[in-house]
Structure formats: structure tokens, C-alpha cells
Regions:
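Conserved C-terminal helix/tail region of periplasmic/extracytoplasmic solute-binding proteins
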Residues: 4-23, 29, 365-397
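Early extracytoplasmic/lumenal segment of secretory-pathway proteins
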Residues: 4-109
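Sec-exported extracytoplasmic/periplasmic mature domains
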Residues: 41-45, 64-69, 87, 91, ...
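Extracytoplasmic ligand-binding site segments that recognize negatively charged/polar headgroups
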Residues: 48-61, 73-85, 95-257, 263
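Paired acidic/hydrophobic, glycine-rich loop segments that form the ligand-binding mouth/hinge
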Residues: 94-101, 251-252, 268-276, 291-293
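A ligand-binding cleft/hinge motif common to bilobed small-molecule-binding domains
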Residues: 106-112, 263, 270-291
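Periplasmic-binding protein-like
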Residues: 129-133, 144-148, 240-244, 287-312
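Mature extracytoplasmic/periplasmic domains
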Residues: 301-377
Length: 397
């Protein structure tokens, strides 16, 4: 229907095949905290939040103190549950959720969920003026996180031993691998696979980074005829995927155990691991000798953004938006609501909020915004390539 098509303000329009990107501003975007609070008191005063981060629980008390008369209820769910519960509520017309927290790392949520009439975008204009436009493209962000390569600081007292992604899989003169590699199974971890997909989309940069690292052109050794879909020829990102899939790796599902493996490694038997940046917490909590590898060429990581939405059909439309503003810092970036999300390995995306927790600021990481549409287009193929090539790896049998 015509009306439905033009109602979509963010996401993939099934009728026209068009993508609509943020930020999208409407009347709500202009309203202040005070205006929203006043309005919130006249509607259903219980605000239900479907959160994917248990840290959201820590906001209940301070929010209710700041805004007397409003009652905040937080449900701690996983990402798929947030979406599936919201869908059931929408389909039955029995809408409980008011605010939804989602995370999209491969474009699936943007392309397949935004257009189901379940999520309503909300971009508060004053706050968005402090956020990079590329971080508003796929939703309104709560904070950024990412995966990082960790190294052992005792084994490498002079600093990180690698400066490019190619060096991670480097071989010694005798053909053996330079580093022991610990990671989650890439093919089952959509955030990691998306990162590898981005290298295929940015193949020119991968080729250049190889040349910068080794002073010669990359040789292509993968066989594009392995698949019944079109694999690009002479693509440095595909070459990287192929070489990485043939490396010797140890898959560990738990992030704390991944960084422990690096902590236990030595200068003679050096190790690297790919884990979520927040695992750096083990350095202070458990005394691990670990640090992040920063500014890897061509880029360190993709920024994965936690996004906030209003549930379509909510009976607390003002209260829901007031809460979204509150946990993203409020008008001045000073609200208590942001505090639980400030930890090492989480980065605020506002330029007017001081980030004291992180050893490196967002601008210093060498990470980049995640282009979800480009990743979504090739993600299934990349998954097939990884899975098939990994199955052919003699070291991983």
C-alpha cells in the first residue's frame, strides 16, 4: 500500500526497494526534557524497557528520582528476544514494550526488522548535533563497542607487535605461524564475520596495507571457482579471508578465557586474541598482562552501535522518549543515566561527553563506522566462504 511505503522513515522499504537512513527528525525530535516529562505524567506512567544490556537495570533508581511519578521497568533480554517479543506484541495488538534496545552488526535488523512496523525511530535533535552523522545512519546510538586484538604486555614490553591485519597471520621463515591465534569461531560470531566482510568491501585498502607492510604487491592464492556464487577475482579481502581460514587457530567461546590465553603466553610462544574490547577489564580485575592493539592498518575494527527505539503503538510515547534522552546523557550530556554504560571498552558517541574510562578515545582507535548495507549485501556469501574454507583447513581437523 502507498501509505505504508511512505510511513517508513528508517530501514529497507519492501515496496520500493529503497533504503532510508538516519537521522530522521519529527515533532518529537524538537521536544525538551521538561516538555516530555510534563507530557509523560499525563500518559501511562510505567515505562517498560526491553534491554540487551543488564547495565540498564542500574538506571532505574536514578531515573525515578530525577522524574518523580514515572516508574521504570527493565527487562534484560538477548537481542533476538527483544525483537521477537516486540513482534508478538505487535501482531497481537497487546503492546507492553515502550523502549527497545537492539544491536545490528550485519545489517539484518536494519533490513529485515525496521520495516515490520514494530520499531519507531527517535532522534532527539539537540543530542544528535553532538554525534557524528555516520553514527546516526542506522539508528539512534546508546554507545559504541568493538572487537579488538589483544597482545601480552610482558612478552612485548615495547608495545604492540602488530600494526596491520596481515601481520596477525604472518609466517616465520620456516613456514610456521608467528603467533598463536585465539578467537571465537569467526563464522558463528556475526560481529567478527562482518569485520571480515568489510575487508572484502574495502579490498583496495587491504591490498594497499599489504604493500605498505611488505613493500610488494599481494599475491592472490584463493580459488574463486570453489563456490556456486560469484566470488570477486583478485580481491584482497577475499584473499585475507582465505589465508585466515587456513591458519592454525584455537576457538574459545568465552571472552575471559580468550584474554587469559594471551596472558598465559610468552615472548617465545607469543599469542594474540580477538575479543570484545571490554575484556580489557581483566587487566585491572585479575592482573592480566594484556592490552589492545590500536590503529591497525587498514583499520582496527568496526564500531558496533547499540541502538534505541520506541515501540510502535506505545502508550507512553513521551515517557519512552524521555528515557531514551536520559540514558544518552540528556540535553547537557550530564545525566546519571549514561553512567552505567561508561566502562572500558564502551565508548560514548557524543562529542560533548568526557570519556575518562578508556585508555584510548574513540577517535584514537582507528576504528570506523559499520556500513551495514554493504555488509548485508555480501554477508551470506562470506559466511559460506568461511565455513567451506575452514572445513578444508588441515590444521583445524
Amino acid at each position: 500500500s502507498e501509505a505504508a511505503a511512505s510511513d517508513l522513515h528508517l530501514g529497507y522499504d519492501l515496496n520500493t526497494g529503497e533504503n532510508y537512513y538516519g537521522p530522521y527528525y519529527d515533532d518529537w525530535s524538537e521536544k525538551t526534557d521538561d516538555e516530555l516529562y510534563e507530557e509523560a505524567l499525563t500518559e501511562d506512567t510505567t515505562i517498560n524497557v526491553y534491554a540487551t544490556s543488564s547495565k540498564m537495570m542500574k538506571v532505574e533508581e536514578s531515573f525515578e528520582e530525577t522524574y518523580p511519578g514515572l516508574d521504570l521497568v527493565v527487562f534484560d533480554l538477548d537481542n533476538d528476544e527483544v525483537l521477537s517479543k516486540a513482534k508478538i506484541e505487535h501482531d497481537t495488538g497487546n503492546i507492553t514494550a515502550d523502549v527497545l534496545q537492539t544491536k545490528d552488526v550485519n545489517g539484518n535488523v536494519f533490513h529485515e526488522w525496521y520495516n515490520q512496523d514494530i520499531l519507531e525511530p527517535y532522534f532527539p535533535k539537540d543530542i544528535c548535533s553532538h554525534i557524528d552523522e555516520e553514527n546516526l545512519k542506522y539508528g539512534y546510538p546508546l554507545y559504541a563497542s568493538q572487537s579488538m586484538w589483544f597482545y601480552n604486555t610482558a612478552a612485548f614490553p615495547d608495545g604492540q607487535p602488530i600494526h596491520s591485519w596481515w601481520e596477525i597471520i604472518e609466517k616465520k621463515d620456516d613456514g610456521t605461524q608467528k603467533y598463536h591465534l585465539f578467537t571465537k569461531e569467526i563464522g558463528q560470531e556475526s560481529a567478527y564475520l562482518s569485520l571480515f566482510a568489510s575487508f572484502i568491501n574495502n579490498a583496495d585498502e587491504m591490498a594497499q596495507s599489504y604493500k605498505d607492510t611488505y613493500g610488494k604487491d599481494l599475491e592472490y592464492t584463493y580459488d574463486a571457482s570453489d563456490f556456486n556464487f560469484e566470488v570477486p577475482e583478485k580481491n584482497a579481502g577475499v584473499e585475507y579471508l582465505w589465508r585466515f581460514s587456513q591458519a592454525e587457530m584455537t576457538f574459545i567461546g568465552d571472552g575471559d578465557e580468550l584474554v587469559l590465553a594471551v596472558h598465559n603466553s610468552t615472548a617465545d610462544e607469543p599469542a594474540l586474541c580477538l575479543a570484545s574490547a571490554g575484556k580489557i577489564g581483566n587487566r585491572d580485575e585479575s592482573g592480566y598482562n594484556i592490552a589492545w592493539c590500536l590503529n591497525l592498518e587498514p583499520y582496527t575494527a568496526l564500531l558496533n552501535l547499540e541502538s534505541l527505539f520506541i515501540a510502535k503503538g506505545t502508550n507512553s510515547p513521551a515517557g519512552a522518549r524521555l528515557f531514551v534522552r536520559y540514558i544518552t546523557g540528556g540535553a547537557d550530556g550530564q545525566s546519571e543515566g549514561m553512567k552505567p554504560f561508561k566502562k572500558e571498552g564502551n565508548w560514548p558517541v557524543r562529542d560533548d561527553v568526557e570519556d575518562k574510562k578508556n585508555p584510548a578515545q574513540l577517535s584514537e582507535l582507528g576504528a570506523r563506522a559499520n556500513d551495514l548495507s554493504a555488509i548485508y549485501a555480501i554477508y551470506p556469501d562470506v559466511q559460506d566462504m568461511w565455513t567451506y574454507w575452514l572445513s578444508k583447513n588441515p590444521k583445524m581437523k
